[in-house]
Amino acid sequence: DTAGGPYTTIALVITSQYLDTAVTEGATYYYVVRALDTSFNRSADSAEVAATAQLRTVTLVFNVTVPASTDATLRSVYIAGFLDRLDGNLPQWNPGGVALTRQDATHWTITFTGKETTQIEYKYTLGDWDHVEKGAACDELGNRQLTLSYGTTGTQVVNDAVLNWRNVLPCGN
């Protein structure tokens, strides 16, 4: 907690690397290492190093499967939501603001980056709120929710499915 100590033991490890995950973003921590040899003789403290905790960047990949009827609309698939919480100065809740990339008639994708623990809500559209995703029985859907998680690779993959669209058969308004 303070430069120059005193120090508190936070872990006993048998590798040459350690990741301290019990930290607070923006706080500065001071670390020293002590080693034991095979006879359990303890070394002196290493030189002190300081580190300031920062949230890690997550690569966020959305893959969405859409109904076969989507292609006949000649519209692109969009994502709308609290995208302004992600990197890149993205719009908030703009139904035609962020287009996905078409992979084939029923698969679309987009990749973002953002900081771990960021929470977002989102929906898929065909460019406007008159063509927003609907449920299996053409029912209204709540917002999808997601918390960015770094995991083991730094990439979070979200596989979603849109069952129907408003104003596209079989759904009306």
Question: What do the PLM-derived regions correspond to, one by one?
Answer:
Residues D1-T8, V32:
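Extracellular low-complexity, O-glycosylation-prone stalks/linkers
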Residues I14-L19, T106-W108:
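Short S/T/G- and acidic-enriched coil/turn segments that sit immediately N-terminal to beta-strands
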Residues A68-T117, G127-S149:
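Aromatic-rich carbohydrate-binding modules that target alpha-glucans
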